[in-house]
Amino acid sequence: MAKELRFGDDARLQMLAGVNALADAVQVTMGPRGRNVVLEKSYGAPTVTKDGVSVAKEIEFEHRFMNMGAQMVKEVASKTSDTAGDGTTTATVLARSILVEGHKAVAAGMNPMDLKRGIDKAVLAVTKKLQAMSKPCKDSKAIAQVGTISANSDEAIGAIIAEAMEKVGKEGVITVEDGNGLENELSVVEGMQFDRGYISPYFINNQQNMSCELEHPFILLVDKKVSSIREMLSVLEGVAKSGRPLLIIAEDVEGEALATLVVNNMRGIVKVCAVKAPGFGDRRKAMLQDIAILTKGQVISEEIGKSLEGATLEDLGSAKRIVVTKENTTIIDGEGKATEINARITQIRAQMEETTSDYDREKLQERVAKLAGGVAVIKVGAATEVEMKEKKARVEDALHATRAAVEEGIVAGGGVALIRAQKALDSLKGDNDDQNMGINILRRAIESPMRQIVTNAGYEASVVVNKVAEHKDNYGFNAATGEYGDMVEMGILDPTKVTRMALQNAASVASLMLTTECMVADLPKKEEGVGAGDMGGMGGMGGMGGMM
């Protein structure tokens, strides 16, 4: 296919036009007084959002070179969202600012490579300053404030996330689901829960809840299908003598074995319930081992030379209580040793560091949470489906931001941290004038998030930025109320990781654009018009009258 080429300033100007158009659409959502953006959908109602990355993802231009610029900045927003969970609008505003200032310098004849080196040096200095300014985010109040800011000043969302983190710990899994009412709800599952229910409804012993509840049971873990009852006789006899109930977790329980267990259960000889093991393949083996460590049991597996016939009561795990429903099994208060459980968690975390797959990382994180004890579910309430989607996206954003805050700490919000980090550039010098220009480009660019927040709130950006720059520490401007003061005391906080990732990603992509000298795109296809003469063949249809 034939290609179209653009070089030098022409290429950069086209790219800049795309970046400006995208940034104009995204930046209106920034800050507490940011506006909504309405996105058309191919079917159903349009989506209303204040989430920068949602807006960016929807934008595409017909003009190929403009589109290439927009797609590169879209990558900044997506990358920041993936790694930090928030800060997408900040990253977009920073990228545009660096590119606009940098383009002026390149047009004035400066060396783009030296400008890039200067920008990179400045980013490194500002990042170090941000990390030095960062304070740990320990208490629920700070977590709630971070969540509130990230959810566009919705205090209810900040409070429910802080409550969820308090209940399941900072490593616990918090999931977001659609609620049924108008209010947000929080439910917490204590202990380990996995998504497998009873194999037969005849195991139910609580008719009211349609569940099987076992108090202080033994737990038999088997890494294969169980179809013959003979294999299990010695274990069943031991359990029956002890008078305690039994939970069997196996790949499957079928045929004669299942029938015998059901009959024994119904006659009250031994109180028993059987469920399928969670997961598939290697993940199933790993999860069985997790349950074994949690309950102080052994997985009966022929791979390690243990047969079901030779199993004894010493091989069985135990827990305080187990609840099995049609869909889920919950193990509460397993009797495993804390040291062994912590060692297992450390081992899974090491695997999380090594894996390159997001799916695998998510599954490993779930396993950590189940071992650490707890899964919280936030059910988002709203009046309409459109509001539900928008609110759910904000809750997920706020959740990511609070995780980032717990991980790397917090800095003053509202763009104040970046203004304070400018001081790190005062003593920074490049190897030549062009590098110094690169440092100055970043110095000006890191004011842009505050300028945009202030502009969206309807105030004069230059006046506010100058006043904030004259003061020290956390002194800043609260765009929601129009007041100056200590940002931390006012509860306006940003996760350090979000601010850092937004700056690094924005500078990385903007520097690449500045050093672009050629752009290549497909030539648009020429539509071949259909000639009117082609319709002539239809004259023969006149003869169809005879068909009547």
Swiss-Prot record:
Q: Which GO terms describe its cellular component?
A: cell surface; cytoplasm; host cell endosome membrane
The enzyme's first-digit EC class, named in words, is isomerase
PROSITE patterns in the record: CHAPERONINS_CPN60 (PS00296)
What does the entry list as the binding residues for ATP? Answer: 29-32, 50, 86-90, 414, 478-480, 494
Name any one GO molecular function.
Answer: unfolded protein binding
EC numbers on record: 5.6.1.7
The biological process GO terms on file are: adhesion of symbiont to host cell; protein refolding; regulation of entry of bacterium into host cell
Annotated catalysed reactions = ATP + H2O + a folded polypeptide = ADP + phosphate + an unfolded polypeptide
- Entries under Pfam families matching the protein: Cpn60_TCP1
InterPro entries recorded: Chaperonin_Cpn60_CS, Cpn60/GroEL, Cpn60/GroEL/TCP-1, GroEL-like_apical_dom_sf, GROEL-like_equatorial_sf, TCP-1-like_intermed_sf
Record localization: Cytoplasm
CDD domains reported for this sequence: GroEL (cd03344)
UniProt keyword list? ATP-binding, Chaperone, Cytoplasm, Isomerase, Nucleotide-binding, Stress response
| UniProt superkingdom | Bacteria
What is annotated about its quaternary structure and interactions?
Answer: Forms a cylinder of 14 subunits composed of two heptameric rings stacked back-to-back. Interacts with the co-chaperonin GroES.
Query: What is the similarity comment for this entry?
Result: Belongs to the chaperonin (HSP60) family.
What is the protein's known function? Together with its co-chaperonin GroES, plays an essential role in assisting protein folding. The GroEL-GroES system forms a nano-cage that allows encapsulation of the non-native substrate proteins and provides a physical environment optimized to promote and accelerate protein folding.
Q: What is this protein called?
A: Chaperonin GroEL
The organism of origin for this protein: Legionella pneumophila subsp. pneumophila (strain Philadelphia 1 / ATCC 33152 / DSM 7513)
